[in-house]
């Protein structure tokens, strides 16, 4: 996928993004408070993201991806492999 745009975030199914944020956080063994501290947001905001009550901005999704070892595309595209972590390029 080419550079992720704000449009791609708006086009992606909100429930997919929410479920993958929760999955990534849990598989990275992070609490809501822990992830919030890393990405600079509140526990309450993360709960809203994980319950599909709010669509994340590109900047926030990028921070969550970095904190959990995922690619931004993994959160947006149902066809991207849902394996726990992206493999490092050799």
Set out the residue ranges of the language-model regions:
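A short, Lys/Arg-rich alpha-helix, primarily the initiator
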Residues: 2-27
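Short alpha-helical elements of helix-turn-helix
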Residues: 19, 43-44, 58-61
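Short basic helix-loop element that most often maps to the first helix and adjoining turn
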Residues: 19-38, 63
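DNA major-groove recognition helix of helix-turn-helix/homeodomain DNA-binding modules
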Residues: 40, 59-74
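Recognition helix of helix-turn-helix/homeodomain-like DNA-binding domains
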Residues: 40-56
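Short, basic-rich loop-to-helix N-cap that marks the start of a DNA-contacting helix
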Residues: 53-66, 82-84
